Each structure stands twice: as structure tokens, then as C-alpha cells.
């Protein structure tokens, strides 16, 4: 039995691997490539150039690979690249890149993009990321591995969301979020670290304790960023997790949420 519903509209130049399933009324345009085992539900629109990897699942009414609404976009050829084992729930929108940046929007592996979330042009999403319902990322946003953005989180363009970080519901993020940090509010403020997430992912208690001390150095001792980073050099040499936290602050271009 065919896995392609006869009511789907698929451009003859689209490339679908073995065992790709396409539901009724979905539209797959030219320049779309879909890896094996991926399931495209009903009423989905896929626009190219877009490459989708293996064993993804895209739910109804999602729009994936559409042109960016950026006013600088003049129809140049840009891309969307999606990895493997992602779940893209109902009504999600993901836009391709712009030539003013990398000309590519990227979604890694094992991500959960929940209903009505938006991923803007040129954004880079790592692996094991969760975007909860109605989270919206503006253009050029980077989200590192294992970050969780709770429902209705808004992220300003060019922000960097660090690995293992967490945002509370309705948070408005306008600066970079360091790795492991938990932020809440509008505007966002740092509240703590994502200790529960660390424990669930098997971090040692020694590493968690070192990160707790590092957080206090940056956020609770009244130091400048330069002073805090200098104090973190020694623990960063001992604990790779602290080094990740330190690097996420050092490489910030928008300044960090404090």
C-alpha cells in the first residue's frame, strides 16, 4: 500500500526517500528532500530548498521552509536544513534563511517543537531542544543543546540561548542566556540554574555544586563580568561544565541576562 495519500500534492522534483508517509492535502514543493521514515501529516506545507532528515514527524497545519518575512529578502535562494528524529507539532512555522546571514536555518536532531511555535530565519537550533507551545524565535537566534523554552517565550533576534538553560512561561528574552541558567519574566531575569534538568541528564553532584558556586560568583557577589570571569578560570579548568558556563558568557555578543 502506498504511503503517499493520493490527495497530497507533490512536485515532481521533490525527492522522497523510502518509507516516507504523506497525509492528505499536504503540499510538498520543488527543492524539498525528505529522508527515510519521515511522516508528514495532513495539511502540511513544505517549501524548498529544504532538506529534512530521517524519522521526523511533522504534524498538521505546519508550514516548513517558507520564505522569510524579513524586508531585506528579495527572493534569493536560501535553505532550511532539518536533521533526524525531530517532532514538529501542529501549526509550527519555520522559515528559511537570508543571504545577509548564513542563508540557512538549521534544526538539529531529537528536538521537540510544540504546537504553534515559530523558528525565524537564520536561526540555529541544536539537539534535544524543546520549544513549548507558542514560543517564538526571531531571526538569527541560536539555541544550544538541551535548552527548554517554556510556553509563550519570546526571543529577540540575534540572542544566544545557552545549553541546558531554561525559561519560564511567558518570558521575554532580549539578551543572551548563559548555559545552565534559568530565566523568568518580562523582561527576563536570571533566577537560578537548571539543576533539575542537570540531575535528569546524569550530571554528577560535584559538577552541579561547582556550577552552583559559579552562578553565585556571576550573579550574587556584586562583581563585574570581568571580575567574575577571572574568578571562574580555576574552577573552569577543573570542571568542563563550568568551562561551558564560562565560555557562554565570554562569547556573548548582546550581553547576558543578569
Curated annotation (Swiss-Prot):
Q: Which Pfam families match?
A: Acetyltransf_11, Hexapep
Where is this protein found? Cytoplasm
EC number assigned by the record: 2.3.1.129
Instruction: Please provide the Gene Ontology terms (biological process) for this protein.
Output: lipid A biosynthetic process
Q: In which pathway does it act?
A: Glycolipid biosynthesis; lipid IV(A) biosynthesis; lipid IV(A) from (3R)-3-hydroxytetradecanoyl-[acyl-carrier-protein] and UDP-N-acetyl-alpha-D-glucosamine: step 1/6
Q: Does the keyword Repeat apply?
A: yes
* Any Gene Ontology CC annotation: cytoplasm
Question: InterPro entries under this entry?
Answer: Acetyltransf_C, Acetyltransf_C_sf, Hexapep, Hexapep_transf_CS, Lipid_A_LpxA, Trimer_LpxA-like_sf
Q: What Gene3D superfamilies does this protein map onto?
A: Hexapeptide repeat proteins, Udp N-acetylglucosamine O-acyltransferase, C-terminal domain
Superkingdom to which the source organism belongs: Bacteria
Cite the HAMAP family for this sequence.
LpxA
What does the UniProt record say this protein does? Involved in the biosynthesis of lipid A, a phosphorylated glycolipid that anchors the lipopolysaccharide to the outer membrane of the cell.
The entry's family comment says:
Belongs to the transferase hexapeptide repeat family. LpxA subfamily.
Instruction: State how it assembles.
Output: Homotrimer.
What is the protein name stated in its UniProt record? Acyl-[acyl-carrier-protein]--UDP-N-acetylglucosamine O-acyltransferase
Biological source species: Pseudomonas syringae pv. syringae (strain B728a)
Upper taxonomic lineage? Bacteria, Pseudomonadati, Pseudomonadota, Gammaproteobacteria, Pseudomonadales
The gene for this chain is lpxA
Amino acid at each position: 500500500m502506498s504511503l503517499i495519500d493520493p490527495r497530497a500534492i507533490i512536485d515532481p522534483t521533490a525527492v522522497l526517500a523510502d518509507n516516507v508517509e504523506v497525509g492528505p492535502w499536504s503540499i510538498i514543493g520543488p527543492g524539498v528532500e525528505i529522508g527515510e521514515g519521515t511522516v508528514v501529516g495532513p495539511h502540511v506545507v513544505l517549501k524548498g530548498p529544504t532538506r529534512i532528515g530521517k524519522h521526523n514527524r511533522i504534524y498538521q497545519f505546519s508550514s516548513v521552509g517558507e520564505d522569510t518575512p524579513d524586508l531585506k529578502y528579495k527572493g534569493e535562494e536560501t535553505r532550511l536544513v532539518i536533521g533526524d528524529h525531530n517532532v514538529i507539532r501542529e501549526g509550527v512555522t519555520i522559515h528559511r534563511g537570508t543571504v545577509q546571514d548564513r542563508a540557512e536555518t538549521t534544526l538539529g536532531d531529537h528536538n521537540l517543537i510544540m504546537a504553534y511555535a515559530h523558528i525565524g530565519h537564520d536561526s540555529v537550533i541544536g539537539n534535544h531542544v524543546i520549544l513549548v507551545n507558542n514560543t517564538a524565535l526571531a531571526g538569527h537566534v541560536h539555541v544550544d543543546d538541551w535548552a527548554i523554552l517554556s510556553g509563550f517565550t519570546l526571543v529577540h533576534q540575534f540572542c544566544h540561548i545557552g545549553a541546558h538553560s531554561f525559561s519560564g512561561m511567558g518570558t521575554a528574552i532580549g539578551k543572551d542566556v548563559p548555559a545552565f541558567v534559568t530565566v523568568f519574566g518580562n523582561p527576563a531575569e536570571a533566577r537560578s540554574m537548571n539543576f533539575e534538568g542537570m540531575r535528569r541528564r546524569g550530571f554528577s553532584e560535584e559538577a552541579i555544586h561547582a556550577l552552583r558556586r559559579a552562578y553565585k560568583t556571576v550573579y550574587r557577589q556584586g562583581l563585574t563580568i570581568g571580575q567574575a570571569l577571572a574568578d571562574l578560570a580555576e574552577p573552569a579548568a577543573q570542571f568542563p561544565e563550568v568551562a561551558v558556563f564560562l565560555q557562554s558568557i565570554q562569547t556573548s555578543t548582546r550581553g547576558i541576562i543578569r
